[in-house]
UniProtKB/Swiss-Prot annotation:
Lumenal membrane side: 23-1364, 1434-1500
Function: Functions as a sorting receptor in the Golgi compartment required for the intracellular sorting and delivery of soluble vacuolar proteins, like carboxypeptidase Y (CPY) and proteinase A. Executes multiple rounds of sorting by cycling between the late Golgi and a prevacuolar endosome-like compartment.
Acidic residues bias spans: 1481-1494
UniProt signal peptide: 1-22
Upper lineage: Eukaryota, Fungi, Dikarya, Ascomycota, Pezizomycotina
Protein name according to UniProt: Vacuolar protein sorting/targeting protein 10
Family assignment from sequence similarity: Belongs to the VPS10-related sortilin family.
Disulfide bonds: none
Ranges for region Disordered: 1481-1500
Alphabetical UniProt keywords: Glycoprotein, Golgi apparatus, Membrane, Protein transport, Receptor, Repeat, Signal, Transmembrane, Transmembrane helix, Transport
Gene name of this polypeptide: VPS10
Amino acid sequence: MILRRLLLAAGSLLLASAFTSAKKADGPKITVTKFKHEPVNLFYFDDSDVVMLQDGNNGDVYVSRNAGTKWDIVDVGEMKGQAWSLMPHPMDRTKAYVLGKGGKHWVTNDQAMTWREFTVDAELSPYQLPLVFHGKDSNRVMLQGIKCSGRDCVERTYYTTDGFQTLHLLMEKGRHCAWAVSTPMFGDGLDLPKEVNDRIFCVVSGLHSQWPEDNRLLYSDRFFKDDSGIEAGLDSGRAVSGVIRTASAKRHLLAATKSRRTNELALFVTDDASGWHRAEFDGQRIEEDAYTILESTNYSLQVDVVSTDSSAMGTLFTSNSNGTYFTRNIEHTNRNRQGLVDFEKIATIQGIILVNTVKNWEDVEKSSVVEKKIVSRISFDDGRTFQPLKAGKQDLHLHSVTDATNYGRVFSSPAPGLVMGVGNTGGHLKDYSDGDLYISDDAGINWKKALSDAHKYEFGDQGSVIVAVYDEGRTNKISYSFNHGKSWEKASLPLPDDVKIRAKILTTMPDSTSLKFVLVGSAKADSDVEHYVIAIDFAEMEERTCVDPDFEKWPARLNEKQEPDCLMGHKQFYRRRKADANCFIKKKFEDPIPNFEPCKCTEEDFECDFNFIRSEDGKSCVPARSLLAPEGACKNPDDKYTGSSGFRLIPGDACIKKGGLELDKPIERVCSDTMKTPAAGEIAVEKTFFTADNYRDYFYLERTGSSRGDDETVIMITSEQEIFISRDHGKRWKRIFEAETITRIEPHRYFNDVAYFLTNSGEGWYTLDRGENFRKFKAPLPPNQDKLPALSFHPDRRDWLIWTGAEECNGSGGQCHSVAYYTTNRGAEWHFLMRYVRRCEFIKRDARGSSDKIVFCEQYEDENPSSKHLQLISSEDWFAEKKVHYNNILDFATMQEFIIVAIRGEKPQDSLSVGVSIDGKTFADAELPANVKIPIQRAYTVLESRTHAAFLHVTVNNLEDHEYGSLIKSNSNGTSYVLSLSAVNRNSRGYADFEKMQGLEGVAMANVVANVDDVEKGAAKKYRTMITHNDGAEWTLLAPPGKDSEGRAYGCSTKGGKPTKACALHLHSYTERVDPRDTYSSPGAVGIMIGTGNVGEYLTPKSSADTFITRDAGISWEEAKKGKYQWEYGDSGSIIVLVPESTPTKTLLYSLDEGRSWKEYQFSEVEMQIRDISTVPSDTSRNFLLWGNEVGQGKKPGLATVNIDFSGLKERSKQCVLNEEKPEADDYYLWEPKHPLQPNGCLFGHRAKYHRKRPEKDCYNGREIQHLDSIGDICECTRSDYECDYNYEPQTDGTCARVPGLEPLDPKLVCTEDPKAIEWYEPTGYRRIPLTKCQGGKQLNHIIAHPCPNKEEEFEKKHPRLRGIGLFFAIVIPIGLAAAVGYYVYQHWDGKFGRIRLGETGSGGFFDRDSPLISIPVTIVAGIVAVATALPLLVSSLWRSLGGYIRVPGSGSSRQPYSSRGAFAARRGDYVGVVDDEDELLGTDDLEDDEEGEERNGQV
């Protein structure tokens, strides 16, 4: 199928059909049809003479019913001129599709005799194949489209089960949807459940994320009706995130996944659409855009994997029958950057493969500019061995797939044994124009030259006729042969005088049984290009039809003795016309049928059984993992049982076992050899000593979910500059770079597998595979002398680097400065970037345009390092052109969603300002809150921005030991900031006591300075710890435990179990940590946090701290142990280890039940001072590493590391079971995080469910699990879903009030910033938290609407006014109800009229302020108190044509949840009018302070 977007053009394509040759009987009949535009998408309906093509310019479609002799335009309905693409059904010879423009399409079910139109409310997707076909039911098709509104586009997938008679929406926002049964062979030989025929797989975004690394693979057997689909259990039944796409090949369905922080892919395979297994490639890495699934056999997959990223070469692999284990066939295959591989299986003959390989691969690997020398190789045994192609005694090399010049297969066709190609003899392949046409009629064993020069070629009548056309320039002749290319005749094309064409396509019907061919070519006439479609018919050249004596029994494969060879248990023969027979077969539409003779079984008929892999010598099959003996068979290690030999007969192999090998015969196995070794039941310890006294730093190169292997790699640099590496988490260490002076190690910022080891000279080494191999590189200059990193890394391109080096800094008299260079191949070649820079950085592409080359640099003004002005400049073309954003900056920071710049003022005493960009192109000045009292803004700390908002710490007091500042939070585009929390502590280095909880969005903790007034007078700081569960909108104190770990009460009391200023839990935070990696929480242990601190009024010194734990994300805490401990999480929180901090010890404490109970373990005979405890960053390992020194009696000198291995512990020796369909059926349960101030359990407007291991289950989690299971109910909006708007600040009772003397942002800006906007809303003091998904409920930010200029008509349609009787009832009924309810409330209410307390929640009964009978009437009650003024205002407001609006409930349950921030904005039509004078009605000028509210909300 060829898909091309076509341009509309005037004029008709078909001009003439007048040139026909009237040849005598010794030549073919040739008919020429002239076209004005280039024909494209030409195809035959299989087993017919019906051919179709598409106008390459004006969107017309043509059909020929006589193999191209006569063409007619398809003029059905509105099809003429509307075709976008034309394609046949790949598995149904009667069906084809014309995909049109504007959602109109056509289908034929009778080879273009009739057409039926169908429509879809979407355009065709430019990112995916438009049609996806079912492998066994041609009426089942999916259409992948896209629906756009302005610049907002949503991908939509539709399906039909009746050949497009009806069409249904399958899902929105799904990509790469595929039928489970995608090929005719899928499931053959298996007893698949009936529902698999309906099963569809789709790639969808993550539940909380749009990043590709969070994509999920969902499937449904009900077309995604009534459910959101089930997540496919790709890895041992567990879901895997980061699914890129799916693909099908014969009997297999494949899914490729990529984890965050690696470009290594994992390939998962299934042959039944239920059980998936990870494919193993004999130790070879598979990387993104670095593998190609090739034409596979009926019994194996063949995949070419890129072997070197510096040039296009690969390794060919072949799988076993279930696609799980791959073995190498041949190295250094030739491929191109588009993923095409020089590989072809010879059609109709099993086991013969033609490939091209790179002869000078070593030179090519060293330099990408070295030209490849390509040689051809052929295999006759399914890729086990390869040999050169031979033309006589010379090696022959042929052009293949990477530079194919024709449709379809390159070398072969269904004509048995006939193979052709363009190439040359000699040492390697030359240019195409230097090639000749070669042919083999024995399936590639022997070759001979057929014609000089390059030709296109095609086979007909099962090989009786071969046609060739000159392909190095223009021609007006064709060549043909009736004797397998031994001799050739020529025929002239009946073209106009002096016209010669350049051949574009030469083709025939797919089965090569016809005597008719179609040639497409173009000729230049003056300034125009003319196009011709030429029908060539040999049917009348021979009258005789072949009979038996004209045929031979031809063996498809021969062995080295030139005898018929066996493959898949049989010999293959064809009844083939003899080369010199003077006849035509004339069996059009009848494919050649092979005959088979069975063979006795040999070793080649067997493959490794499931759970076995080939041994290193390839002669036997050894267990890939521990075997399971039959139940009850192994009671003692010395027992024996009968089990698999390790081999099995390849499925589909027809060999005869009698008299042959029976490698699959069960054998006797010893239980001690094959049983899984029982857990020793103990923790294992490995201690290692080093000569250095201490370590300078260490870091992990951690495997990701898609990484192969089982290493846990740690790299350490000691205080003596020695570099050590351990691949087994510190059990064994190896020194590296002993002869080199490594001065710095720079792990790749974005890819876990990569690290760079640098010297002061500019030479260095790097690893791409977590320390398994190291390669050397040379930088253009020594590292810079600005104490800044020499390397800057690209977020998406692993091999793109920027090197900032020092020039003229060797005392030569020049001006020392920094120069930046870039490379796209890890330093193999460097290119100049910028001079006189301080630093340069790549900018992440996502949501910031389409260019990978966006680079930001800080450059000194006028390239003068003495200048005090540092400019921020950017470029998208390596600074061929540049853009200056700011002329005088202090620094800039790149974050996941924003680029934030600190800008200096004109004078030294001026405050800093902030600039923000989300696309790297346009910057806006950040609007900082005026209620942050900062005399001069001198320092900012950029925190994080993973929740669609940026957090900044703005320093208020910068005096040493008295530093603190305000925590401010942005809106979704980073430009408008509001105060989140005052007086947040920071240290002299600029670090703030602020930390977000890992694994759970919106939860963060901060330490505040509680005695600000005293600190301003010089007093020491006193701290309190605060927590937020709605991303900084509301903060509360930490609730203290009821009792300590020894059961004693604390010396202070709470109020109703809630914290007070005098009694709360306070924890030591970021600024007091020796290692900032020691965080409260873990990405794997969702909901758990550990910290050291105390209960009381303030945080006390660390020396008196105890250790506390929470298991519900900070809502409740308990004391884990008395004293201060260092902690680390393992196995995603199923193991927690505590080690005393600052106290010598021989023992550690560990918990297997999330800290509910603790056990002591002695890890050393000598007391040690433990400096740190570590594990892999994801906290998924069962290994821990202690770093310290022996200090007790009998101590050894030097640094010691102690590996603590829990994998042998009996309680952690069995893998936990997670069933995605029934997530709570086995070892896991679903945990819902909650908001402490919301009784309904909602957090960010929804209820999310996370997988957590049941604490009582004795098993281990293993590799990182996908914790987030689902997002359940969407909640109504409450106060917790809003934060204070710009220039508003929170009050003690939780409401938001405008800062006195300041104005809100101009709300009308939405009209100018968004041309599609219809309305704007008056400021209310509230704005939605960007992370919330809430729907309905309190719409605190959208109450009073007004039309945008010149949008009054659209506004009126959106908000129709009440008229007539409707208006009367709108006035009278509310007043009557208000009077009645108001009177009742007046008798029962507590007298606090005129007070709106938006921060309060709870179920306070019938007359609670959130009660539906009170929350609205109370505003009117407030008006009744002043009825003389309020009522006229109410009445008059109803007559205003542009009044404000309040929400009117719709159909309720039919609504869909908001899927994005834009989705909420799009529902502004759900509101109708109320009064403009609402503030006066609500009495908001009379709000009072409330001590009770202060204590309840914990607001500071």
